[in-house]
């Protein structure tokens, strides 16, 4: 299809310009009466035509007929007004008006088309001017005369016995439309130049003609698959996020470092789900504004809100998962983060900073479902506010996970010596969870970069579709089909299941039952409805304090804990005086965190509290 359009352009340029560049001073030229059956007869206001030496009407008419009847010629132009003016200019350029009986010379001179005829083409064929590379109304012939004079051309004929300043009027037939309204082939939308220059979010494919909104670039089946996947998984993820926030934020007696990170993750996942919910709210396609052809941008409040939530949720989740992997790394190495509060404040400050900074640059695109940082004009905001911080944090996450895997591998001998494979299983489960979620966030952060640097694939699909519209019309052109839908679907899938992964990695564990059983608030609520489960039904103010340990709470649990028939006594680090006691502390603290995050620095925190 693209090749056909190129052939059309060759036809246009060749037949437009071939006759125009013939030498105007041709002593062998002659005048003839135009054959009335010529296809150009209705476009000329004269019958006396100019024939250069060596040409006959039959030769010229054969070329005219081939051009005007060829499906890849002028007939491919869908706009009738533009087509009429182009054919008129073509005819008066091919069959130029002949001027004979000029004083002092024996050969005729042609009249070139008046410049206003050329301007009519420029005015009425704006959407197609990009196809006429090099075409101008200020061209000259081989004698240096204007191809499209304003009123007349002047010739020095003294060498032939004529005047030194012979004027020849230009041809200006009355036929042809003077309507200068630009018409865009359906379904392209006409937009004024001022609107486009004002920075409105249009996708201009030809001068003043933009892509419609919405523009569907996948099949209905593909859109449905993506839609139902996102609806189900985002709803489930939002529910899980609320569950994690309630469990580790309200139900648990003492909030540990690890609990705070899980709460943070719950809020970032909720922000991601809120972004999806915002774009699904209301009627019509979220990408489109009320103005035809204009895609939403930050000047639309709901687009700004959606972009903010998406940036908060996406980048925030990456930051918090990196913080979680750092906490896991410290726990494996029996250390604690003494500056956890400052770290948390700093991370949240960065998240808000990178979400608010591009607040005026959120926009929707052809391929997007909602709004995010646009790269329509430049990519600075996308790189500075997402790619650079996301990739730096992801790289740190890889380092923490790799170091933790190595530590777990080294501790395998210890796990075997105490004959408790459950500990090894729990830690391997944590590592597996981190690796899977690392893959998801890496894929979702790399996919937009892949699209940016492979945009030609998508632009080519749009270009072929536009060429088809110009050649055949909308009814004969199939829907645009972007390739690599599998990657697009995988990106949506990985993003929507973050909450579900958090459930399997953090929210399903025997330790959760202990949290609910020992929770004073939860048991108090059960007591109000007549259910007795656990120990203390009345909440105390003391239980609401926060702990900087990564393990769970409860003085009873600190003294002794039973795990699948095996009881391990916990002792303070400062009370251990032998290697056996040290091993007992290490094994007990490892087993104390059934969610598979080792809890050895619990004892360090107790020691610090005693001091």
Curated annotation (Swiss-Prot):
Keywords attached to this entry: Disulfide bond, Glycoprotein, Membrane, Receptor, Signal, Transmembrane, Transmembrane helix
Any one GO CC term of the record: membrane
Cited Gene3D superfamilies: Frizzled cysteine-rich domain, Rhodopsin 7-helix transmembrane proteins
Topological domains, Extracellular: 25-230, 280-302, 360-380, 452-491
Topological domains annotated Cytoplasmic: 252-258, 324-338, 402-430, 513-611
Cystine crosslinks: 31-98, 40-91, 82-125, 114-184, 118-170
Residue ranges crossing the lipid bilayer per the database entry: 231-251, 259-279, 303-323, 339-359, 381-401, 431-451, 492-512
Glycosylation sites: 63, 140, 156, 165, 179
InterPro entries hit by this protein: Frizzled_dom, Frizzled_dom_sf, GPCR_Fz/Smo-like
Domain FZ as annotated: residue spans: 26-187
Biased composition (Polar residues): 591-602
Cellular localization per UniProt: Membrane
Signal peptide interval: 1-24
Main localization, broad class: membrane
Topology class, membrane: Multi-pass membrane protein
Biased composition (Low complexity): 538-554, 576-590
Region annotated Disordered, chain positions: 538-611
Family (UniProt): Belongs to the G-protein coupled receptor Fz/Smo family.
Name used for this protein in its record: Frizzled and smoothened-like protein N
Classification lineage: Eukaryota, Amoebozoa, Evosea, Eumycetozoa, Dictyostelia
UniProt gene name: fslN
